[in-house]
Amino acid sequence: FTGSRHTTNPLAISNKIFDKFIELGGIYINQHVKNLIQNEKNIELLMEDKKIKFDKIIICAGAWSNQIANMLGDKFPLDTERGYHILFETNEKLINRPVAWSESGFYLIQIHNGVRAAGTVEIAGLNKSPNKKRLNMIERQSRKVLPQLGKVQSTWMGRRPTLPDSLPIIGKSQKNNNVIYAFGH
C-alpha cells in the first residue's frame, strides 16, 4: 500500500493529547469509582477519598465500563477481547509499514524503540491471567517472518471492550439523562 501512515510512538501522541487537555483546563483524577449517586439534576461520584458532583458524566472506561454502568442499573453484554503484545529489540529499521500475518492473527510494526508484534483475539474476561501460549506463538511466528529480530524487550496483554455484535455502546443511558456511554470495540 503506497501512502500508508502509522505512528512509531503511540504513547508520545497520547501524552500530547493529555497535556493539551490539562492545558485547556481539564482535571485528571486517578481514583477508583466506588459508587455513583444519581438524581434528576446531577450525579455524584464517590471515589476512594473524594466526592464530586457533575451535571453529566461520560462513561468510557473501556473493558471496565460495565462495572460503572452496573452501579447505575444499566447492564450490557460486555466482555473482554484480550490482545497480546511483544516488543523486540532491534538497532535497524526492519519494516517500513505495518505487516499482517493473517494465518496467525497478528501484526508487526516498526516503532521508535524496536519492532512490536501484536494481535490475536481471546475472549477471557477481566481477571484471568495472561495466556503465555499466545505470547510464545506470537514470538515464534514473528521470528519466522523477521529472523533478525533481537531479544524480547517486553510483553503485555491489553483488554479491549467487546460486545457480541462488535458494535460500540455510544449514547445516553436509557435510565439516566445525565449519563452518556462511549465504550466498545
Label every model-predicted segment:
Residues 10, 102-103, 143-185:
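C-terminal catalytic lobe of FAD-dependent flavoproteins
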Residues 111-147:
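Conserved FAD/dinucleotide-binding core of flavoprotein oxidoreductases
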Residues 47-96, 148:
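Central helical "cap/lid" subdomain
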Residues 44-46, 116, 180-181:
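General beta-strand recognition
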Residues 11-20, 31-34, 49, 88-109, ...:
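Flavin (primarily FAD) cofactor-binding/catalytic cores of flavoenzymes
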Residues 1-56:
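Helical element adjacent to the flavin cofactor pocket in flavoenzyme catalytic cores
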Residues 5, 105, 123-126, 179-185:
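Glycine-rich phosphate/pyrophosphate-binding beta-alpha loops
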Residues 25-27, 115, 179:
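Short, conserved active-site loop motifs that form the nucleotide-linked donor/cofactor pocket
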